[in-house]
Amino acid sequence: YDSVTVGIDLTARDKQAEARANGNPWDIAKGFDNSAPIGKFIPLPEQTPKADNINFSLFINGVKVQQGNSQDMIFHIAYISQFYTLKIGDLIFTGTPAGVGPVKIGDHLEGYLEETKVLDFFVK
């Protein structure tokens, strides 16, 4: 692989709470339409050809709410590739850095890799 991006793994908390209250699995709260928007892919930085030290961040309405680094992944890409065949286009979500919170209709979300904006959308 030679490019990376950011993605957001959204959860419909109302659907999650309803499913939990009824003793049902809550995967519907994770798998709704448009529940995992991803940004545009950009080439890996020359200094991190293995994607193992890349800063990423999320802004909501201009306020930084999350930041992380790919080196903080519990399981790195090399480890994951022992169990799964990875091909160009496969997505690996790194986990959730501190700062998880609600979003609402009209919120403006922007995702960055280092200083490059790769994701930009409004919640509908």
Where are these regions (language model features)?
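Active-site glycine-centered loops adjacent to acidic/histidine catalytic or metal-binding residues
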Residues: 9
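Catalytic-pocket segment enriched in acidic/His residues
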Residues: 5, 13-124
